[in-house]
Amino acid sequence: MAQVTLYNIKGEKIGNIEIADEVFNVEPNLDVMWRYIDMQLTNSRAGTASTKTRGEVAGGGRKPWPQKHTGRARQGSIRAIHWRHGGVAHGPKPRNYLKRLNKKMKKLALKSALSARFQEGNLIVVSDIRFEKAQTKQMREVLKNLGIADEKVLFVLPRKEEVYENVKLSGRNIPGVKVIIADNPNNGNPVNIDGLNVYDIINSSKVVLTEGTVRKIEEVLSK
């Protein structure tokens, strides 16, 4: 099994922990990661864009001028697509953009993304991060202690508890910092680690996990 340095929130090394090779040290599959991100971003589209065709725009039922003897180009309706205030040809209509991936591919994509960050040396594991109250100052201090104050950072916390929600709130006003709850049942994640996703991992230069998060991810992705 691979080993990773364990830090506390003061940035001090307090030991090493083993992490599962089959989760954090696989060969990244770029194709599957792309498919996951494509699915994720496509599914985030509302699909509500709508335009009116010439038949749906109000008015235009009367021919604007006679067909002949005016010297003007013949026109059948003031709602034709080339008229101002006319309809739109081939414009968007409400549609469902839903894409799916099977569970095996979703798991492989998550493993690939986590492994890529680990192999680059951009995966940081801390013993735990708990705040008794939400305070941006505390989060800035943690970032400074870990030497990642100027990085784009993703924090993944193990479960939904008040002390972890406070961490999430503490990071929301810091540019480049995102905090997600791995065990959040309201976030709609495909493999029951709700909140953890490939796009956020790849979109961050550093990924910070707690030891509890590591074990939770191993539990789900090793199945």
UniProtKB/Swiss-Prot annotation:
Part of the 50S ribosomal subunit. Keywords: Ribonucleoprotein, Ribosomal protein, RNA-binding, rRNA-binding. InterPro entries: Ribosomal_uL4, Ribosomal_uL4-like, Ribosomal_uL4_dom_sf. One of its GO terms (cellular component) is ribosome. One of the primary rRNA binding proteins, this protein initially binds near the 5'-end of the 23S rRNA. It is important during the early stages of 50S assembly. It makes multiple contacts with different domains of the 23S rRNA in the assembled 50S subunit and ribosome. Forms part of the polypeptide exit tunnel. It comes from Fervidobacterium nodosum (strain ATCC 35602 / DSM 5306 / Rt17-B1). Belongs to the universal ribosomal protein uL4 family. Residues 47-72 are annotated as: Disordered. It comes from the Bacteria. GO terms for biological process: translation. This is Large ribosomal subunit protein uL4. GO terms for molecular function: rRNA binding; structural constituent of ribosome. The gene is rplD. Transmembrane segments: none annotated.
